[in-house]
């Protein structure tokens, strides 16, 4: 997860040079976005699987299929929400600790990024796929942080 956050910070940093970098910078930003999505999904699945196996051991054999499905769904959502909180913290850390300085524009970008992240739980409750919701966030962040 630490590597993911480092990659995320590097991706955010590259967005500040997007306009001056030409087509290669744009393609790198897009490939970076989908690389981060893939890594995020892999991490989420791994954490969820570990937590499900831990919980399943606690309630061995005493549950029906419906109860087990509900448990798995709850763990999946809980893990995702926990990771989204950490994405918010990583975005905040980048915005406040960046070498580019803490300007009013950076603060506004941070606020808009966090607002977008806060929309995701509602979209997920409406059965939007996890990866699609996160893709929405990353595309919005790409647009926000690539602006001068």
Where are these regions (language model features)?
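Charged, glycine-rich active-site and insertion segments that engage polyanionic ligands
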Residues: 1-86, 93-148
């Amino acid at each position: 997860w630490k590597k993911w956050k480092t990659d995320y910070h590097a991706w955010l940093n590259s967005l500040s040079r997007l306009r001056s970098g030409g087509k290669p910078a744009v393609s790198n930003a897009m490939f970076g976005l989908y690389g981060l999505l893939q890594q995020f999904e892999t991490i989420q699945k791994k954490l969820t699987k570990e937590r499900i196996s831990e919980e399943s051991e606690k309630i061995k054999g005493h549950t029906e299929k419906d109860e087990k499905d509900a448990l798995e769904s709850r763990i999946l959502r809980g893990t995702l929400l926990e990771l989204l909180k950490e994405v918010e913290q990583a975005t905040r850390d980048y915005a406040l600790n960046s070498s580019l300085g803490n300007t009013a524009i950076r603060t506004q970008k941070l606020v808009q990024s966090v607002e977008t992240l806060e929309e995701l739980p509602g979209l997920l409750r409406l059965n939007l796929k996890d990866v699609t919701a996160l893709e929405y966030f990353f595309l919005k962040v790409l647009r926000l942080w690539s602006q001068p």
